[in-house]
């Protein structure tokens, strides 16, 4: 009887953890050719609200105009942000606009910089998520040199990258505690990436563990 109770409690805890709303942050660094970027130019906070992921933040030093804004598959920001790999696209679809039914999970469209001052970022997306099998935690957010053509252009790169040009800045997306979200970027509080990018252990812990526990529970009961 005790074993049953323990397993039921363990299963409920795992299910609750898997569905828990996670908040995340990415510190944005200016790309440096061949190097890991070190110049901090902004911060972006991620907040899951129902089925929508909300991104809010600001970045400095961008040229006026629109810049492609994407989630990339890896959290490695080395080599001038090139080590982040391509757009996060686990379903192998063509590049598109944020409101397209077929698009990369990482396709967040464009952000727009003013003629002077910081670039304010306010984006909502219904496809990217901070939890589940296709979580973007531990991946990277990348800001590009040019406007993303949203897959509507005539360039050969339109259907893969939106022809958005080189990578100007990037940052790894990591989970944070509520108290850290209230701090400034100057103090650079710790951001936690609980599992390496591309590691199956993260997906097993959030997606498969409740299923495994349910199987064990059904065998015992």
From Swiss-Prot:
Record GO biological process: removal of superoxide radicals; superoxide metabolic process
Residue pairs linked by disulfide bridges in the UniProt entry: 81-170
Top-level EC class as recorded in UniProt: oxidoreductase
Signal peptide boundaries: 1-19
Pfam families assigned to the protein according to its UniProt record, in alphabetical order: Sod_Cu
Keyword annotations from UniProtKB, A to Z: Antioxidant, Copper, Disulfide bond, Glycoprotein, Membrane, Metal-binding, Oxidoreductase, Secreted, Signal, Zinc
EC number: 1.15.1.1
GO molecular function: copper ion binding; superoxide dismutase activity
Glycosylation site residues: 56
Protein residues bound to Cu cation: 70, 72, 87, 144
Binding-site residues for Zn(2+), renumbered to this chain: 87, 95, 104, 107
Name of the protein in question: Extracellular superoxide dismutase [Cu-Zn]
Organism expressing this protein natively: Caenorhabditis elegans
């Amino acid at each position: 009887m005790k074993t049953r109770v323990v397993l039921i409690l363990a299963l409920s805890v795992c299910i609750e953890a898997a569905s828990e709303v996670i908040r995340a942050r990415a510190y944005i660094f200016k790309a440096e050719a061949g190097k890991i970027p070190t110049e901090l130019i902004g911060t972006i906070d991620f907040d899951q609200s129902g089925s929508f992921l909300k991104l809010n933040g600001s970045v400095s030093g961008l040229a006026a105009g629109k810049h492609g804004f994407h989630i990339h598959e890896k959290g490695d920001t080395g080599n001038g942000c090139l080590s982040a790999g391509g757009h996060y696209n686990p379903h192998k679809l063509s590049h598109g606009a944020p409101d397209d039914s077929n698009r990369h999970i990482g396709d967040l469209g464009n952000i727009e910089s003013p003629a002077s001052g910081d670039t304010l970022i306010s984006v909502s997306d219904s496809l990217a998520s901070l939890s589940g099998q296709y979580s973007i935690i531990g991946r990277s957010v990348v800001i590009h040199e040019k406007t993303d053509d949203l897959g509507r252009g005539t360039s050969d790169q339109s259907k893969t990258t939106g022809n958005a040009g080189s990578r100007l800045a990037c940052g790894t997306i990591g989970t944070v505690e509520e108290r850290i979200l209230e701090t400034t970027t100057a103090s650079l509080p710790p951001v936690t990436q609980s599992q390496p990018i591309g590691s199956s252990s993260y997906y097993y812990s959030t997606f498969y563990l409740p299923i495994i526990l349910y199987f064990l529970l059904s065998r015992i009961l």
